[in-house]
Amino acid sequence: HTVASELKHYTGYGNPIGGLNCAPTTMGRHDVFSYCMPVFEEAFVKAGATDTMCSYNSIDGFPVVSDHEILTDVLRGTYKMPGFVRSDMTAIIMQHTAHHSAATPKEALQKAVKAGVDVQFADYSHEEYRRLMKEMLADGSITMEELDTSTARVLRVKDMLGLFENPYVDETLES
């Protein structure tokens, strides 16, 4: 394999309240599981999609980025997704700034990691992300096992793509 397919936006995105980007979805959990999830199931189970970008919306008031059932139980348990979960742009910090489901940026990150998010996308500067991860490891908010598992998911995709054997691009190919 030389290409990994990353599906987005997992899940329930596309029907936001008032048509506003990032707004909670108008669909309840039952509708999301009935109408949205089967599409992702087909993509992971039958088509072999590798990883996903989770959406920044909430379903019934619960942000997808911190939903363990959706990101871990279903995605990795039922669908057997082999890769990683990337947060959509600012999805993690939105738990603090928009959804108000996390009291602090640190709590927002902890909830995302615990739910199964492996890669953050523009939520924190690299310095702040490293600082918060170190703090959470030190105070027990997350475990080294959780961090190792998350890191292994990212490395697994890189290994599947052969990036450890030949990390170069054939520059003679046209895009």
Predicted regions and their residues:
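Glycoside hydrolase catalytic-domain context in secreted enzymes
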Residues: 1-175
